[in-house]
Swiss-Prot record:
Keyword Cell inner membrane set for record: yes
Source organism: Rhodopseudomonas palustris (strain ATCC BAA-98 / CGA009)
Bilayer-crossing regions: 4-24, 31-51, 59-79, 85-105
Keyword annotations: Cell inner membrane, Cell membrane, Membrane, Transmembrane, Transmembrane helix
Keyword Cytoplasm among record annotations: no
Subcellular location: Cell inner membrane
Pfam family name, one: UPF0060
Gene Ontology cellular component annotations, sorted alphabetically: plasma membrane
Membrane topology reported for the UniProt record: Multi-pass membrane protein
PANTHER family to which the protein is assigned, alphabetical: UPF0060 MEMBRANE PROTEIN YNFA (PTHR36116:SF1)
Protein name: UPF0060 membrane protein RPA3838
HAMAP family to which the protein is assigned, alphabetical: UPF0060
Length: 110
């Protein structure tokens, strides 16, 4: 469960950091937006190292489902774009995949 909370925090940082670049390049915001953006992206990378997984690739794969759902929620909360049924179905499929990767029974390598 710790990984799930870590992934949620990481998603917030990644999306906020990337949005800072989006705001600068696409919305004509000040380059000063890049400062908190880069800090958020650095915190995102650090948070992913806290995932309860011995393998980086598996942690990143599981994180992907959380990222997708979080990005849709960001679009709704920050950009006012309510997810449609296809967004919700797609995110649900990704979260099922994330659950299989994160919570599936594992045997530890020797």
């Amino acid at each position: 469960m710790t990984s799930l909370l870590t992934f949620c925090a990481a998603a917030l940082m990644e999306i906020a950091g990337c949005f800072a670049f989006w705001a600068w390049l696409r919305l004509d915001k000040s380059p000063l937006w890049l400062i908190p953006g880069m800090l958020a992206l650095a915190l995102f990378a650090y948070l992913l190292t806290l995932a309860d997984s011995p393998l980086a690739g598996r942690a990143y794969a599981a994180y992907g489902g959380i990222y997708i759902a979080s990005a849709l929620l960001w679009g709704w909360a920050i950009e006012g774009n309510r997810p449609d049924q296809w967004d919700v179905i797609g995110a649900a499929i990704c979260l099922v995949g994330m659950s299989v990767i994160l919570f599936g029974p594992r045997t530890l390598p020797a």
